[in-house]
């Protein structure tokens, strides 16, 4: 929020009532008169107005009709006058029920310990498998360290004008070969 300026007679500015309310820049308070919120948004001013309107001061103790003092409270009735409430007393359990509940509790405990044992066995198996895989990987890495692959260097062959002539030469040679073969085929008939 912006600065809060409380009006005093020295700071009282002659503003007409409409302009003063249009700015939404003030709040009337019961304690100090008017409070001006300069530079505050209208939303902040509305929140402040609601806040100041919601504040109610409690009257002094002398003017209250009822006091919170313990002397005005009613006395508590003695326990001897109250009938015994059987609804809140625990019902005694039968021996069969007690034995059944104890057995069920033991069975749950046994099942839980078995489950934990199975989980620990499974965890150990997973750790052994990871260890085995790690050892195999390390063996493969050792084998690869001893064997270094040859680096392949490929020569890039750029075509030149002599290459074009060479390409034509095989074509001519192929034509000559086909002609010679054609003559041989005719001779073989």
From Swiss-Prot:
It comes from the Eukaryota. One of its GO terms (biological process) is cilium assembly. Residues 144-189 are annotated as: Disordered. Belongs to the HOATZ family. Residues 144-155 have a biased composition (Basic and acidic residues). This is Cilia- and flagella-associated protein HOATZ. Residues 162-172 have a biased composition (Acidic residues). It holds the Pfam family HOATZ-like. It comes from Branchiostoma floridae (Florida lancelet).
């Amino acid at each position: 929020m912006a600065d809060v300026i409380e009006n005093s007679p020295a700071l009282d500015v002659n503003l007409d009532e409409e302009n003063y309310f249009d700015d939404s820049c003030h709040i009337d308070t019961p304690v100090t008169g008017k409070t001006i919120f300069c530079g505050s948004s209208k939303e902040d001013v509305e929140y402040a107005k609601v806040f100041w309107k919601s504040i109610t001061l409690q009257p002094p103790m002398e003017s209250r009709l009822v006091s919170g003092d313990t002397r005005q409270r009613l006395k508590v009735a003695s326990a001897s006058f109250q009938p015994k409430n059987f609804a809140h007393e625990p019902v005694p359990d039968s021996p069969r029920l007690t034995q059944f509940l104890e057995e069920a509790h033991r069975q749950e405990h046994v099942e839980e310990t078995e489950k934990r044992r199975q989980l620990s066995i499974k965890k150990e198996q997973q750790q052994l498998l990871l260890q085995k895989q790690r050892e195999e990987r390390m063996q493969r890495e050792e084998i690869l360290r001893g064997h270094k692959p040859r680096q392949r260097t490929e020569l890039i062959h750029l075509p030149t004008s002599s290459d074009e002539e060479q390409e034509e030469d095989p074509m001519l040679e192929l034509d000559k070969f086909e002609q010679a073969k054609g003559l041989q085929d005719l001779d073989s008939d």
